[in-house]
Amino acid sequence: MDLVNHLNDKLLFAIPKKGRLYEKSVSILKGSDIKFHRSARLDIAISTNMPVALIFLPAADIPMFVGEGRCDLGITGVDQVRESEVDVNLPIDLQFGTCKLQVQVPVAGEYTSPEQLIGKTIVSSFVNLTKKYFAQLEGVPESEMVTRVKYVGGSVEASCALGVADAIVDLVESGETMRAAGLTAIATVLDTSAHLIESKNPKGDVELLRTIKSRIEGVMTAQKYVSCSYNAPENKLPELLKITPGRRAPTISQINDSGWVAVSSMIERKNKGDIMDDLKKNGAEDIMVFEISNCRV
């Protein structure tokens, strides 16, 4: 990472280097109009339109780089932040990579509650979070806990079947891998998702930092909302505005038709079908929904 030491005029943004987190992160960058080209063999890419350097790192390493102020911003999971035990800001939930860090035991086994695992052997790649969880369960400091926690970097779900562990603590998204391994969850240690994380001692330009955060907030809002427009009879406007109150307030415009107005409002994407149906039932006409490619809120 010696090259980073020579990028003093750039804001350093740590990005997961592979997998679904990488793909989703790149989508966020594109939506934020941070343009770049990444060479196949390099883990650093310079933005072509902003004074930003993208540093591609394993997701588990990003909290350390941001926490130590080596990078100004990063994208990684809350699980990685908590496991790393670093002090960073988490300004934006990016709403992908959503999963649970759970205590899992064999389906056909004797354990049905985490309390039964006190004094047993637990395997996880999240050793710090696992120790903290079981120390709290035992009501003692970590140095005095009797539960044994072992680190395994991958294929954690095989540990019980191989006799290495009585239980595991691992991430669960859909649960398919867990069920395929003959495991079931009996407790949740942490709910997690990908977040934008920010150094508490950024070295990059503070105004640029604010701009990037604002752009990413705009991308997230555009993903959550759509724009809904319709024509409304003035005598039914109060009821229709209850259906589409907007983020702050709807926009109401006069049209060249006596007794009618045009209404435009932001509505949640997930509810757009029901909202359009309700508008129609309450007298609205010419109801249209438009995508929001980006915005500032």
From Swiss-Prot:
Broad enzyme group: transferase
InterPro entries, A to Z: ATP-PRT_HisG_long, ATP_PRibTrfase_cat, ATP_PRibTrfase_CS, ATP_PRibTrfase_HisG, HisG_C, N-reg_PII-like_a/b, N-reg_PII/ATP_PRibTrfase_C
One GO CC term, this protein: cytoplasm
GO-annotated biological processes: L-histidine biosynthetic process
Top-level taxon in the UniProt lineage: Eukaryota
Entry keyword set: Amino-acid biosynthesis, ATP-binding, Cytoplasm, Glycosyltransferase, Histidine biosynthesis, Nucleotide-binding, Transferase
Pathway(s) annotated for this protein in UniProt: Amino-acid biosynthesis; L-histidine biosynthesis; L-histidine from 5-phospho-alpha-D-ribose 1-diphosphate: step 1/9
EC numbers on record: 2.4.2.17
Compartments where located: Cytoplasm
Molecular function terms from GO: ATP binding; ATP phosphoribosyltransferase activity; magnesium ion binding
Keyword ATP-binding part of the UniProt annotation: yes
Classification via Pfam families: HisG, HisG_C
Keyword Transmembrane attached: no
Chemical reaction(s) catalysed: 1-(5-phospho-beta-D-ribosyl)-ATP + diphosphate = 5-phospho-alpha-D-ribose 1-diphosphate + ATP
Family: Belongs to the ATP phosphoribosyltransferase family.
Cited function: Catalyzes the condensation of ATP and 5-phosphoribose 1-diphosphate to form N'-(5'-phosphoribosyl)-ATP (PR-ATP). Has a crucial role in the pathway because the rate of histidine biosynthesis seems to be controlled primarily by regulation of the enzymatic activity.
HAMAP family: HisG_Long
Record's protein name: ATP phosphoribosyltransferase
Organism: Kluyveromyces lactis (strain ATCC 8585 / CBS 2359 / DSM 70799 / NBRC 1267 / NRRL Y-1140 / WM37) (Yeast)
Lineage of source species: Eukaryota, Fungi, Dikarya, Ascomycota, Saccharomycotina
Gene name, Swiss-Prot/TrEMBL: HIS1
